[in-house]
Every structure is written in structure tokens, then in C-alpha cells.
Amino acid sequence: MNKYDHKISQKNVIKQLDETVINKIAAGEVVERPASAVKELIENSIDAGCSDITIEVADGGKTLIRVIDDGLGMSDIDLPIALRRHATSKLPNDNLLNINSFGFRGEALPSLGAVGRLRIISHNDGNGAHEINVNGGKISDIKPAARTLGTTIELRDLFYATPARLKFLRSTKSELKAITDTVKGLSISTPNVAFTLIDKTGGKSRKILQVQKEKDVSLASIKNRLSRVLGQDFSKNSISIDVTREDVNLTGYVCLPTYARASNAMQYFFVNSRQVRDKQLIGALRAAYSDFMPRDRFPAAAIYIKCRPDFVDVNVHPGKSEVRFRDPQGIRSLIVTGIRQVIAIEGHRSSSTLSTAALGAMREQTHQMPSANNEQVTKNSKNMKMMKNCLLYT
């Protein structure tokens, strides 16, 4: 018999898996790489109502991930419960069609504790701060600790308990870039939260990203956050969008066609503040620019979709990176028509401004040269025609 034959021996009996093994299996879906762990921990902090998050990593998150927040915190009673699989405070009515938080499955913390060395220190308004540790699935006793209101979660030696996973990780540089991209996306989704990302590799402390808290989540605040995270060029070459159809609101900033990119790396989609990489949304954005941009170029955009929780199912992917809308064609239509309209309006405005400026310049030139000969007049006419045919978005 081939050694890879998958036939089950009659001697094997069905048995219940150990809780530690279950958590390790779950970790394979929840935590693919250090950036996945960072995402889960930051989302927990945001769900806890924090206004400031500091993320510290070392060696691309392989040896250290530490997330510090000023959220509600957990009591000494909640700490051990939070480490149980499928224990959560985010489904009060057990309704998966009415999710108003990032997390809801109760899988992140037990999964992280199963594959790494996890330490949680938390302080709420109750009886002070407490600490609990998990090493490869083994939970320690709770003990008193010191810290202000909020939670600190420290994950060391990710995948030490499942060493086979380590060889699938990329270089430290690549893993750090993935973490940086994750933090950028989450910071764009929640402009009313301050973010600081620090690389502590080699015992040093290098600040990679720092953005201050914006006053709200308005379009103006979103633009400020985008400018700080993506740069002034994006801000200067983008236009705002704010359209509503029935119970769905589409807001954000989309680039001018002249600001085309070589890849789709600068495309951000948020559904009820949750960042997603959904093929349907990516395709809709592509379709919106099909008349303005070559196929080998990509638009830059930050698109926020707000809708009722029961209008979208976020429980269709282990990493929650994909969603399923009740009316997918309606969402696509809203994106395509909404973006095309704002681009057309901006193009008309730019064209009118350009034509007015060109006409003024030509009149000034004619006024200064009253005796222009026929050759000069012909030249001026050609210049005027060229100006009119200029790109709308320059």
C-alpha cells in the first residue's frame, strides 16, 4: 500500500480532539502570518472603544507583536473567558446578520495563545489591572499587574508551537511591509483613532507610522487621514464622492484618471468600517474607470460603504476579507455610476477653468499685439485649438 494512502484503518476510532489541538487548527485559518495577528489584535482594540493604539513589532512580527490601547479593558473574570474558543461579547443577541463590530467569532485570542507565547495585561473600571499568560495553549493563573485603563497584548515567538508554519513565512522585510500595510488600512478605516507603529528589531526603536486622532469620521477627517497615510500626492489628485441610494451610502476619495498607478496596491475598500479585498468591489472600481484609463493602469481610491448590518454578510471568509451583499448588482451600479459622475463633473470643471484661462491669455496677447499679422493670428488660433483639446484632468 502506498504510504500516502488516505484510507482510514478499521482500528482507528472517532475521538474528540483536544482543545489545544482545536485551537492550533483554528489558528491556521485565523493567523496566516504576523500581519494577520496584528489585524486581529488591532480590531479587538477598536471594538473596545479605544482612541489610541500603539503597535510594537520585532523581526517582522516573528519574535514580538505588542498592541497597547486605551480601551475599556477586561476584568479578572473576563480574562480567562476571553481565551476560550468562541467566547465573545460582540454577539449580544446571537444574531450573525446584525454584526456591528470587527470581531464576533471569539477565535483570535485562543488561536494566538495556541501557537505562540501570549501575555495579556488589562485594566477596566473594576478592581485594577490583571495579567494572564498562555504558552502553546497552556493557560496560567491570573495575577495582579500594573497599567492604566486599557489593554496590552504581547505575542512572542509566533508559531513556536507549530514550527512547520515558520518556514512558510517570508523575509523579515516582507513581513514588516505586510504589517505596515495592515496598520495603514486599519488607520484609514478609523480616522478617529490615533495609530503608532514602531519597529523594535535589534533592540532599536524605529517609528514607521504615526497618525494623530481626527475629531470625527467626516469626509474632511478622512481626507486628512488619507493625506497623512498615503501622502499629499493622493490628496491633491483625488476628488470626494458622497452618494446615497436607498439605504446604502458611498463616500470616500477617488483619484483623477491622470493619477493612474502601476498596480492596485493603492485601492482601499471599507464596508461598515471593515477593510475588505472583495473581487466584486475591485471589479466595480475597474469598470468605473474603463473609459478613462488604459487596462494596464489602475485607479487609486479609498471607498467607504455604509449600510445596514443585515444588508451584508461578513461571515463568509475566515479572514473576513470578503463580504456578500444582499444586492450585489445594486452595489456595483452605485460604485460605477457614482464614480463616473464625480469624474465627469470634475472634468467639466477643469475643462471650463482651462478654457477660461486660455481665452484670457489669448485676449491679453491680442491686446498687447494690436498689429499682429495674419501669420500670428493663425498661430494664435492653433494655440487656442490645442488648449481646447488638452486633457481634461491636467
Where are the regions a protein language model picked out?
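N-terminal phosphate-binding caps/lids of nucleotide- and nucleic-acid-binding domains
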Residues: 1-392
